[in-house]
Amino acid sequence: MADQLTEEQIAEFKEAFSLFDKDGDGTITTKELGTVMRSLGQNPTEAELQDMINEVDADGNGTIDFPEFLSLMARKMKDTDTEEELIEAFKVFDRDGNGFISAAELRHVMTNLGEKLTDEEVDEMIREADVDGDGQINYEEFVKMMMAK
């Protein structure tokens, strides 16, 4: 599984892993797993974390070594951003179902997610993703934006 990762990704994961391996013993605790993954741009839910930990932590000792961590990250990266998930996410933002995400729709969803954004910040997000310059985000632009992270 981990053999599908680039050397660069492996180096990045090793660096992140080391940051959280406080005592340098080559393992991280399960609590730290969520923090490590979030630092790498992943966003696992509590349930996903528990599942991953259960899969990886075979002896139930509450720690994960680097090879286990690598296979975990490889698995997680393979699962992210499927076409289906992107379509579902787009529908969440496109509240009126017209095929476009407006500034108002973006602001509404971001507010519901607990992100308090100024009008300027919302406009900036739209501008960054709005390839054709029509002031809103269509599905293609949304996919590009999501895959660029």
Swiss-Prot record:
Classification of source organism: Eukaryota, Sar, Alveolata, Dinophyceae, Peridiniales
Source organism: Pfiesteria piscicida
Function: Calmodulin mediates the control of a large number of enzymes, ion channels and other proteins by Ca(2+). Among the enzymes to be stimulated by the calmodulin-Ca(2+) complex are a number of protein kinases and phosphatases.
Protein name, per record: Calmodulin
UniProt binding sites for Ca(2+) 3: 94, 96, 98, 105
Gene Ontology molecular-function annotations: calcium ion binding
Record: residues binding Ca(2+) 4: 130, 132, 134, 136, 141
Keyword Protein transport: no
Modified residues (N-acetylalanine): 2
Further information: This protein has four functional calcium-binding sites.
